[in-house]
Amino acid sequence: MKTRSALVAVSTAGLLLVAGTTAATVAHAADLPPGAPPGVCPVDTEHGPPLASPTTTASRLFGARTFLEGPVWVADPGYLLMSDMRAATGPQRVQPSTMLRYTPGPATVETVVAESGSNGLALSPDGTSIVAATHDQRSVSRYQLADLSRQTVAATFQGAAFNSPNDVTVRSDGVVYFTDPDFQRGRRADAMNGRTSVFRVSGSTVTLVDDGLRQPNGIALSPDGGTLYVGAYGENKIYSYPVRADGSTGPRTLFASIAGPDGGTIDCAGNVYWASGTDGLVHVFSPTGVKLGTVASGAGTTNVAFGGTDRQTLFITSGRTGDSGLYSVHLGVPGYPY
């Protein structure tokens, strides 16, 4: 999730930018666990263009919410979960949030976790739980779908509390990557000393990916697991990182530039979809960074996920006051459930 202030757009990307990390040999994609959740992307399938038109428009499914974020599709039995974030409260000025469930045909919307504390959501590789960026406890959490019980995945790095974990993605072997800007830290102590970072969780071990980004926000993995994408909201840029077989990453490069990059997702052809909270569009890029077009929805677009019976419906959350809602459009390629 972003702040509500507008940022100025920057020019289209194309130059290489290397982070202050040590370069290392990256494993070939064939040696990597896939980034796509198991069963989502058909193997050895040719895909056509994702957009019928370079300027596509989504339809509104429902509104009258506060600030929707973090959509994730649960294929069995077939519903979409998302976070609804409210205004900051209490002396620490922390934003409460609920977890909602949208079920299509006939459409219903209901609260499943009244105080989830969540922002970005992802699906575990076995499909039994939701991995959530939970800013209420400055942690990454796991919600079991069977009973919605909550467990902590990660709460500190080298003994220091995170700022406010924002968005999350999970590799097929269970390695978790998440962003940690300070948007929902409120008045709680800055244990990160001004740094906003990207982290990796392998088992119980938390490792720093990058602490040189200004307000990292959305995060996603390529279908072959070989590339990690991160949107830096404070820089108007989307970066990519090569991923090694053990989950570690190489130097970042500039993938694309859009105004206010929020949440992102990937389709099974490797195309990259990124929500812009500034212009209210979802920007679509090829795996090489070529701009394919945009999808228009509500102002203040926050995040995206694929779902539906054929996984070709792109769900889009919008969070701007007065225009918060869920939108959808059917596309030509199936994609990730978060």
Residue ranges and their predicted role:
Residues V18-A36:
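C-terminal region of N-terminal signal peptides and the immediate post-cleavage residues
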